[in-house]
């Protein structure tokens, strides 16, 4: 399970990157984390940090920390990334090892989540995207991103948390 950029900056009302109230998103994501953990999945969190930044996305910023509400445990992997793709110059490939399947959720759907999906697809992963555990700034962008990915990468599975739990 790869959880992309569930960071505090998205929940800061003073931030240009504020997504609004994402409590329900976090609750659904915690259900996903708990379910995957019970199934023995490796849990990987990514966090976006801009290398030369001195603002909200800098290493020292509270905004780049993972959300406290997430069900994190000591054995979970946290990968700091510096570009849109979680694969780019990170240890994600190494952490995924010989896995053939990847479950994806995260923020922003149309940016880092999409980039992860595209790069995982090009690496021949079997991909399941948990739609209701992804978020971006507006519904139209969210829907277009999923529609476009479906149209261009037919093998990707798109489910909500309830569907995923039932099918697994």
Residue ranges and their predicted role:
Residues 1-77, 166:
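Active-site acidic carboxylates
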């Amino acid at each position: 399970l790869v959880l992309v950029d569930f960071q505090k900056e998205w929940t800061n009302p003073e931030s240009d990157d504020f997504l609004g109230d994402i409590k329900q998103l976090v609750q659904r994501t915690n259900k996903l984390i708990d379910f995957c953990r019970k199934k023995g999945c490796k849990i990987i969190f990514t966090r976006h940090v801009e290398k030369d930044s001195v603002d909200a996305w800098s290493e020292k910023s509270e905004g780049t920390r993972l959300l406290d509400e997430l069900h994190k445990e000591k054995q979970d992997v946290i990968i700091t990334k510096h570009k849109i793709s979680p694969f780019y110059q990170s240890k994600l490939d190494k952490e995924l090892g010989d896995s053939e399947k990847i479950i994806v959720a995260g923020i922003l759907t149309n940016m880092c989540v999409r980039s992860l999906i595209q790069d995982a697809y090009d690496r021949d992963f079997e991909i399941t995207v948990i739609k209701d555990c992804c978020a971006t700034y507006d519904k139209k962008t969210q829907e277009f991103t999923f529609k476009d990915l479906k149209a261009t990468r037919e093998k990707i599975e798109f489910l909500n948390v309830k569907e995923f739990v039932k099918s697994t």
